[in-house]
Structure formats: C-alpha cells, structure tokens
C-alpha cells in the first residue's frame, strides 16, 4: 500500500510537468492572423454517404426513354412473308385427307396443320386469337389482290391466249407483218371523216357568237349546188335539165306511134302506151272513170230484174227495149265527144318537148289538168244521166204490151247482138 508521502510526491511531479503540457498544446497556434487555413483532409465515411442518399435527392435524374423492343404484329406484311401464306402453300401438298367416313379425323388433321403453321408464324398469340387476326387481315386490299393473283395462277390457260401466243411466235419467225391494203375509196372516206367539223374549244366558244358553237356540217360533197341568182338555176343545172328533156323527147320519138282509132272510146283492144306528161288524160284514167260511173249506177239498177250491169251489155242475149231517137242521138254525141278528147290527148303526148319550154310547161300542164278534170266530171254526169234514162225506158218497156216487146226483140236482136259482141271484144282488150 503506497504511503501518503509517495502520493504527494507523484502529485508534485505532475504539477511540475504542467508547463510542458501548455507549451505542447499551444505549439500549433500561430499568432499570424493573415495566414491561410490549410484544407482539412477528406473523410471517407461511406456510412455517412449512404445515410444522405436514402431519400435520393442528390441523385441525378435520367430523362431519356429507353428504346422499346419492337412489337410484333400479325399484319399483311407478315402474312405475305416467307413464313406466311407462301409457306402454307408449300406445306399444303403434305396434307392428306382420307375422305368419306373419316370426317372427324380429317378435321383434326386440318386444325393441327393450321396450328403448326401459326405457331411458327406468330407464336405470341394462341391458336384462336391468331385465326381471328388472320381473318381480319385477309379483308384488306393488299391481301385481296394477292389472293386473286394466286387464284389466277391456278386456273388453266385459255385456248385463245395460247393461239395468240402461237401466232405471235409465228409472226416473229416469219417477219414483220405488212399492213393490209385498203381501197382508195375507203381511204377517201377516212380522210373525209377526219376532216369533219369539230365543236370549238372553250377559248373560241365565248370569243365569237354563242351560236357559232354548234358544229357546221361539211357541205363539200353532200350539199346540193347553191343557186347563184336566188330561184334561177345556174348554167350547169340548166344544161342538165335540157339534156334530160332532149333524152326524154328522143325516147318518145323512137317509140311506135299510136294505132289508128277504131271508132270507140275503148280503143282497138291493144294496150296503149302510157303518156309521160300530164297534158291530157291517159287510157287508164279514162277506164277508171268509166268503171266508177258504172259502179255508181249499179245500186240504182239493182232492183230492176232486166237491166244489165253496163250500158254496153255483157255479151249475152237480153231482152231489149225500144229507145227514142233523141236519146240515141245524145248518147252518140257523148261518145263521139269522148273519143275526140282521147285522140287529142294522145296527139299532144306524141309531140316532142322543146327544151326551151321546160320552165313554162309546168304551169300550162297544171292549167290543162284542171280543165280536163272539169271535162271528166261533166262526162261522168252525162253518162250517169244517160244510164238512168235507159233504165227508166227499160222499166217502161217491160210493163208495155207483149206484142210490142216481141216486135222490138225480133227487130233489134241482130243489131244489139253485133254491138254486144264488139263491145265484149273491146273490153277483153282493155281489161
């Protein structure tokens, strides 16, 4: 145990060393206030750094987006790729179906075939989803055109196309084909068609009158020649008309002349040449007028049992009646006048036509035609009156004395028979 004196000695020694401690403590102090402070050494305190970064305030932010991986889609581009429908077409020959009686197994085999193809084409989707995507993509225009192209490739080639190809090859071997020869008339027609008038463009439409927009017909070859002096024809037309009139006159002079008159309005039984001009009535018109007069007189004489259908008789024996002398004279005068008019018309038609009178002949012909029509009307009226008087005389004679009728029949039978025979011969020549 240490004594008290020893402890006191230790304290005294420690007090003596106190001055050294102060000196040592103040040794680092510098009284220069302008001295630079030396930097403190950096502290590598990792634990402190971790504590400060807990909230992430001092950490730098990265605002750039990271590139995403490309999203694979089942679109028309993927279907038309090598793994798409082209691969399906190559795999199709390997699919074998058994047919009738194996429908279930064939359907399962077909579904597995498509599932294998879709798993390789688009493995991301299930089989049902992939089928729906393929169906939706198949309605696009690109897929439709591609499908139609594949269908056309499978169709057999038409015989016409093969013939055309053979002909093309043959033409290439023989040489260039020459164009077919065309007649000159068709070339002229084609040129005329190309020179037809065309509708003017919009620039010319409003530059001139609005009515000039209508195409004008090409009158170079189809329009008739225009007359220089209004209604007066030019020299070429007049020469053509004169030449035509001369040709007609020459043809009429070469024809055989009319036969001599036989003393009857019906002629001599031969068919007369029809006149070409309308200067006088021809035989056909006169025959038509006579037939019309007879047809008009038939209804009035239908109730009379003895009267014939015509004033000239029908060639059969009939019971005649006595007619007064005045009626016979009127009838003879009427027939003579008709014959004279017929002969005058024939003579006028036989005369040649003067070419200089072509222009004024139409007016005179129209005037003569109107006069002849009036004469024909008068002739029809006179003949109808004569037939009516003859019918009345026949009715009166039939109701007279039987002896008078017998005498009349025996006295005039011979003459009437001859007249009837002559009339029948003339009618045979006409009709």
Curated annotation (Swiss-Prot):
Query: Which UniProt keyword terms apply here?
Result: Cell cycle, DNA damage, DNA repair, DNA replication inhibitor, Meiosis, Nucleus
Where does this protein have compositionally biased stretches of type Basic and acidic residues? 42-51, 400-416
What are the Low complexity biased-composition ranges?
Answer: 1-14, 381-392
Q: What is its main location?
A: nucleus
Q: Which InterPro entries match?
A: Csm3 (IPR012923), TIPIN/Csm3/Swi3 (IPR040038)
Which stretches does UniProt call biased (Polar residues)?
215-225, 251-265
For this record, an example GO cellular component is: replication fork protection complex
Would I find DNA damage among this entry's keywords?
yes
Source domain of life:
Eukaryota
UniProt subcellular location? Nucleus
Acidic residues biased stretches:
325-342, 417-431
UniProt-annotated stretches for the region Disordered: 1-20, 32-51, 191-431
Q: Which residues form a coiled coil?
A: none
Which Pfam families has this protein been placed in? Answer: Swi3
A GO molecular-function term, please?
DNA binding
Q: Name one GO biological process term.
A: replication fork arrest
What is its quaternary makeup? Component of the fork protection complex (FPC) consisting of TOF1 and CSM3.
Similarity field: Belongs to the CSM3 family.
Functionally, this protein is described as follows: Forms a fork protection complex (FPC) with TOF1 and which is required for chromosome segregation during meiosis and DNA damage repair. FPC coordinates leading and lagging strand synthesis and moves with the replication fork. FPC stabilizes replication forks in a configuration that is recognized by replication checkpoint sensors.
Could you tell me what this protein is called? Chromosome segregation in meiosis protein 3
Query: What is the organism of origin for this protein?
Result: Chaetomium globosum (strain ATCC 6205 / CBS 148.51 / DSM 1962 / NBRC 6347 / NRRL 1970) (Soil fungus)
Annotated gene: CSM3
């Amino acid at each position: 145990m240490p004594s008290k004196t020893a402890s006191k000695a230790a304290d005294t020694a420690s007090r003596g060393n106190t001055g050294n401690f102060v000196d040592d403590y103040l040794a680092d102090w510098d009284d220069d206030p302008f001295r630079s402070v030396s930097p403190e050494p950096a502290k590598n305190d990792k634990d402190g750094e971790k504590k400060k970064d807990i909230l992430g305030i001092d950490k730098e932010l990265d605002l750039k987006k990271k590139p995403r991986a490309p999203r694979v889609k089942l679109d028309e581009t993927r279907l038309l790729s090598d793994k798409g429908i082209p691969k399906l077409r190559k795999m199709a020959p390997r699919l074998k179906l058994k047919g009738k009686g194996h429908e279930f197994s064939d359907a399962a085999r077909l579904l597995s075939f498509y599932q294998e193809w879709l798993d390789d084409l688009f493995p991301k989707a299930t089989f049902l989803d992939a089928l729906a995507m393929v169906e939706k993509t198949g309605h696009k225009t690109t897929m439709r055109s591609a499908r139609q192209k594949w269908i056309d490739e499978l169709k057999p080639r038409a015989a016409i196309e093969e013939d055309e190809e053979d002909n093309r090859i043959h033409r290439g071997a023989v040489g260039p084909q020459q164009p077919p020869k065309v007649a000159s008339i068709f070339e002229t027609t084609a040129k005329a068609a190309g020179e037809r008038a065309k509708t003017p463009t919009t620039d010319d439409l409003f530059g001139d009158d609005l009515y000039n927009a209508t195409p004008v017909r090409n009158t170079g070859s189809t329009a008739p020649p225009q007359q220089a002096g209004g209604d007066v024809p030019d020299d070429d037309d007049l020469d053509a008309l004169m030449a035509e009139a001369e040709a007609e006159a020459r043809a009429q002079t070469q024809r055989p002349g009319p036969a001599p008159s036989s003393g009857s309005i019906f002629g001599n039984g031969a068919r007369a040449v029809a006149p070409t001009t309308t200067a006088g009535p021809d035989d056909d018109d006169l025959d038509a007028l006579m037939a019309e007069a007879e047809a008009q007189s038939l209804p009035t004489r239908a109730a009379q049992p003895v009267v014939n259908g015509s004033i000239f008789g029908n060639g059969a024996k009939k019971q005649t009646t006595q007619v007064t002398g005045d009626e016979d004279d009127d009838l003879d005068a009427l027939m003579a006048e008709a014959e004279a008019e017929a002969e005058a018309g024939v003579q006028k038609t036989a005369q040649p036509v003067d070419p200089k009178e072509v222009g004024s002949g139409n007016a005179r012909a129209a005037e003569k035609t109107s006069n002849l029509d009036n004469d024909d009307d008068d002739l029809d009226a006179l003949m109808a009156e004569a037939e009516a008087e003859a019918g009345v005389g026949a009715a009166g004679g039939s109701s007279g004395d039987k002896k008078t009728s017998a005498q009349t029949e025996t006295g005039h039978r011979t003459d009437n028979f001859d007249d009837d025979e002559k009339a029948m011969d003339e009618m045979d020549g006409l009709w």
